[in-house]
Amino acid sequence: MLIKSLVQKNQVYFTNNSLDEKNICDLSKLKINQPIVHFEHGVGRYQGLTTVTTRNIKTECVVINYAQNSKLYVPITYLYLISRYIGTSKKDIPLHRLGNDLWNKEKKKANEKAYDSAAILLNIYSHRISQKGFSFKKHHTKYKIFCERFPFTLTPDQDSAINSVLSDMYKSTPMDRLVCGDVGFGKTEVAMRATFLAVCNQKQVAILVPTTLLAQQHFNNFTLRFKYWSTKIEILSRFQSETKCNEIINNVNIGNVHVLIGTHKILLKNLKWKNLGLLIVDEEHRFGVHHKEQIKLISNNIDVLTLTATPIPRTLNMAFVGIRDLSIIATPPKQRLIVKTFVREFSYTVIRKAILREILRGGQVYYIYNNVNKIERKKIELKKLVPEANIRIGHGQLRSTDLESIMNDFYHKRFNVLVCSTIIETGIDIPNVNTIIIENANNFGLAQLHQLRGRVGRSQHQAYAWLLVPSLKDIKSDAKKRIDAITSIESFGSCFELANRDLEIRGIGEILGNNQSGHITKIGFSLYMKLLMNAVRNIKNGYYKPLNDIINTYPKIELNVSNLLPDSYIKKVNHRLFFYNKIATSNNFLDLEKIRLTLCKNFGNLPNSGDYLIKIAKIRLISKKIGVKKIKSDVKGGYIEFFEDSKINIQNLLKEFKKEKNCWKFDTSNRLRFSKNFKNNSERIDWILNMLININN
């Protein structure tokens, strides 16, 4: 009851769950007939936006088509009920019937599965936080000197990620943090600073990477970065002889090696670390199940830092629900240019022009040809085509000494075209290489294409990626989707969008396995993530809430005013939907004011209906925070209805009563009615917003 709850002076803590909504449930890129999920009605097909007028009040609605050609009109103020459908191939996407009970049954079953998954995830989490780890001590002076020798300026996201990692390491609970950022965005510097802190605390560091070439590159970079410090850094890969490997292993075991970088070889059983304190895993998804089990064995009770440019669903699941800590690096280094991507049918003319353009400006070229048996023939073919180029080949079947020599020569610009397999896919960083040509790009996965494209554009020069396919007409459906996706995802910090598109193309079943994914395909990945996060919250708090409570916690705001961005203000539908989505997923007033400024800057002063839209979003935010269930109002007054378990600051509410004593009265135990003659809608909305702010303060 409200009267009882008024006595409780506890303030409600409002959590920021925007991460999943902004990156997984982004509606702004919807296309006509694309599948979409409504929480209460199921999976339909998006049909665009339309303006609906009721009693001279205009609102814009999302139109969703359901089975039997039924249509549902969803006001943009209820966008929180909608999410993109991600889950299975196009032909298998469900289409529900309005008014049919099947959707509720599927949703209920998925919710039960979400609770099962949440229990497993929380068990992992509770095991981790119950472990006693090492609390790293700060070494201010040394650390400051180390940081000052970094030759670049940190981006804000880099700085934030580093601070989060160090904060984790200072705690006695073992760190388990994922740093997610696009290729070339500075994840390695985060790892280096964590490594430095560990070494200062006399702890050993293991850096696990998926490929020999990446291990060699990390070894070179770490050696250069630590050259002013007495830090012993070694590398363990197939580039070393057996004798050298045994020598390194022995030195690790007795503590003479401080940092060991390597492939899966660093998981060998005969490695007995003397004082391992930090494990850094680069591109975790590249390791198989067996290697991941070995990682678990060596990572017990130590801090673990994982770096990735291509997050996978399970990793995202654990990060989004708070089981793993997550840092995102989404801002590029200064002067970094977006890689220009072109799709062309295989053409010798295109290849010659692309190679010549690059080498004539003093640059270098990767030519990806993923058929090792014929790669020598391809080199000869390209040499005839572009005699001006100095061409060599590189692939994983070469002797380790030969491959190391080739990559070293390429790095030092001793030749300018490398015809290679996907061995260069992960992490190789050669700033002078600014053109990549991928032959038979239709045969590569989306994440692979993204990683390969990330090998170029590592400097201030404009970089180019050429995706060559045998035929644009005959390309298979899924391959076309991958090619279309990689060309459309050109913006910086697009790793989350990449993960979503990969889910859309491959389907949940292929990525998570059919046993785990059946219930997800029926409701979509976006909604499943909401159910999972809700389940985790409820289990943590020790209760089970009904399914509908997920939505019922959102207050209903009915103020009888037009609140929309009219097409006379923003003409393009998807631009309006973009801003509607941004407003709907904002979690604080500052974000909403930034949206207001962006709108004014790009489209001019907001019309009244746009101003009301943003203010109503603020009213909804603060109403949710203080436990308001519904607000209904017109020009003569209205009422505020509270949830029974609302926790309101009684003193602040009494202050509001005293300001306008004749304005208020309770008409039920949970409903507070107000009577007031407002001059206009603007005054009324401002009054309601300010009143809620005063109650909350």
UniProtKB/Swiss-Prot annotation:
Its EC number is 3.6.4.-. It is an enzyme of class 3 (hydrolase). Keywords: ATP-binding, Cytoplasm, DNA damage, DNA repair, DNA-binding, Helicase, Hydrolase, Nucleotide-binding. It is found in: Cytoplasm. A motif (DEEH box) lies at residues 282-285. ATP binds at G181, D182, V183, G184, F185, G186, K187, T188. The keyword DNA-binding applies. One of its GO terms (cellular component) is cytoplasm. Residues 350-504 form the Helicase C-terminal domain. GO terms for biological process: DNA repair. InterPro entries: CarD-like/TRCF_RID, CarD-like/TRCF_RID_sf, DEAD/DEAH_box_helicase_dom, Helicase_ATP-bd, Helicase_C-like, Mfd, P-loop_NTPase, RecG/Mfd. Residues 168-329 form the Helicase ATP-binding domain. It holds the Pfam family TRCF. Gene3D superfamilies: 2.40.10.170, P-loop containing nucleotide triphosphate hydrolases, Transcription-repair-coupling factor, D7 domain. One of its GO terms (molecular function) is ATP binding. The keyword Plastid does not apply. Couples transcription and DNA repair by recognizing RNA polymerase (RNAP) stalled at DNA lesions. Mediates ATP-dependent release of RNAP and its truncated transcript from the DNA, and recruitment of nucleotide excision repair machinery to the damaged site. In the N-terminal section; belongs to the UvrB family. In the C-terminal section; belongs to the helicase family. RecG subfamily. This is Transcription-repair-coupling factor. It comes from Buchnera aphidicola subsp. Baizongia pistaciae (strain Bp).
